[in-house]
């Protein structure tokens, strides 16, 4: 039986089959066909990409809140916002089963050791989102009993501003965390030794959107938003 494979657009110059019926075959054509059928690269890059894809699309949050920002965080789990779209709807009651922790609310000095202990009980890889002005910098509580920013004792990956932030802001912070995880480079197993973790630099959204904000000329009143 003789047959020829054809593409959807057989008249395209680079999509004519079979190649053997052509009078001349350029090196570029052969190279294009090779790259379409053979992966040219490191298997390690493919493996890291697959692992990061699985990690960022299956983030299990630790069910833990401190203040009013926690109410806005839990609102993101309701149907209008549907955090399940990002694979982060599986709330865990134990830090050992969670992938990331959201510090949502005011962090008092008495609570800081407990938060740090809960963070240490989380298994690697783990991430932290600081949600709200109080968690970011102490907010309006510039007093001795409030920690002026949870990054003083925890490594924070994403800061979500607001007092309190809307659920949409929390979802944007979650998407930024997913973007950061997708670019991470960390050992695939602890067996190979401690090789450190590479995290890509994530510039502040305030700086990235500066030109966009300056370009706005028509400002609507609050009752029109």
Curated annotation (Swiss-Prot):
Pfam families: Oxidored_q6 (PF01058). Its cofactor is [4Fe-4S] cluster. It comes from the Bacteria. InterPro entries: NADH_UbQ_OxRdtase-like_20kDa, NADH_UQ_OxRdtase_20Kd_su. It is a peripheral membrane protein. GO terms for biological process: aerobic respiration; electron transport coupled proton transport. The keyword 4Fe-4S applies. The keyword DNA-binding does not apply. [4Fe-4S] cluster binds at residues 68-69, 134, 163. Binds 1 [4Fe-4S] cluster. SUPFAM superfamilies: HydA/Nqo6-like. GO terms for cellular component: plasma membrane; respiratory chain complex I. Gene3D superfamilies: 3.40.50.12280. Keywords: 4Fe-4S, Cell inner membrane, Cell membrane, Iron, Iron-sulfur, Membrane, Metal-binding, NAD, Quinone, Translocase, Transport, Ubiquinone. Belongs to the complex I 20 kDa subunit family. NDH-1 is composed of 13 different subunits. Subunits NuoB, CD, E, F, and G constitute the peripheral sector of the complex. This is NADH-quinone oxidoreductase subunit B. It comes from Pseudomonas putida (strain GB-1).
């Amino acid at each position: 039986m003789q047959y020829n494979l054809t593409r959807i657009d057989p008249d395209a110059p680079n999509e004519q089959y079979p190649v053997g019926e052509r009078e001349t075959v350029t090196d570029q054509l052969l190279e294009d066909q090779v790259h379409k059928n053979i992966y040219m690269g490191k298997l390690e890059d493919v493996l890291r990409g697959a692992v990061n894809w699985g990690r960022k699309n299956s983030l299990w949050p630790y069910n833990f809140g401190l203040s009013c920002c926690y109410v806005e965080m839990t609102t993101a789990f309701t149907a209008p916002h549907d955090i399940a779209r990002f694979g982060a709807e599986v709330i865990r009651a134990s830090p050992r089963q969670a992938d990331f922790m959201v510090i949502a609310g005011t962090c008092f000095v008495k609570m800081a050791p407990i938060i740090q202990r809960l963070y240490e009980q989380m298994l690697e890889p783990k991430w932290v989102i600081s949600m709200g002005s109080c968690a970011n910098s102490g907010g309006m509580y510039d007093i001795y009993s409030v920690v002026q920013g949870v990054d003083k004792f925890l490594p924070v990956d994403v800061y979500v501003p607001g007092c309190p932030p809307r659920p949409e802001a929390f979802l944007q912070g979650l998407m930024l965390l997913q973007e950061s995880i997708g670019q991470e480079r960390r050992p695939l197993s602890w067996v190979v030794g401690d090789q450190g973790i590479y995290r890509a630099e994530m510039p502040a959204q305030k700086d990235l959107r500066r030109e966009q904000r300056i370009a706005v000329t028509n400002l609507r009143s609050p009752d029109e938003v």
